[in-house]
Amino acid sequence: ISGMPAVGKTSVSHQVARSLGTPMVGGGDVLKEMAVEEGYTPGGEDWWDKGDGMKFLQERKRSADFDKEVDARLLKKAKQGDVVITSYPIPWLTKDGIKVWLSGTVESRAVRMSKRDGIGVTECKEILSVRDRENHMLYKKIYGIEFGEDLKPFDLVVETDSIDESRVAEIVIRYVKGRRD
């Protein structure tokens, strides 16, 4: 499951994994493990959007090795069997699996992020604009991916602006079960 920051990937992925009885692994979780290996102390969903998290993301831009290692670890987990993975680039890096893109405007994602992180919607829009731009540049540089623009790898695209995360999860679950039958 992929999509722009704060579109609901993690929440939806947890619901999908629980319903399908499979483990869930997040690219952010693996990246946080690597941040710990680098001496950081990540914590909370909003860690990326504040002090140390943003500093780590800046350091990460100096070398593609961080992201390539995260992606290698996720691809390894994917090859082990049924698993729900949240990741920005993995859908472009493998032909295997059912690939889902969650779509949402900056406005709806900012509202979601504001509720989650307890910061103002305007500040969230600014943070998301920076993250969106940086993710696009990063994955273009590392893999040649037009992140957020090229949706060809995806089997299912779900627009999340007008429906809640539970409904998004239901749509994904129904699609996955239909593909399994």
Question: What are these regions, as identified by a protein language model?
Answer:
Residues I1:
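Hydrophobic anchor at the beta1->P-loop junction of P-loop NTPases
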Residues K95-R131:
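Conserved phosphate-donor/acceptor-positioning beta-strand/loop module used by diverse small-molecule
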Residues T10, G28:
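Walker A/P-loop
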Residues M4:
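P-loop (Walker A) phosphate-binding loop of NTP-binding proteins
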Residues V121-I171:
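Small-molecule kinase domains that catalyze NTP-dependent phosphoryl transfer to phosphate-bearing small molecules
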Residues D29-L93, E107, I119:
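ATP-dependent small-molecule kinase phosphotransfer cores
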Residues V7:
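ATP-binding Walker
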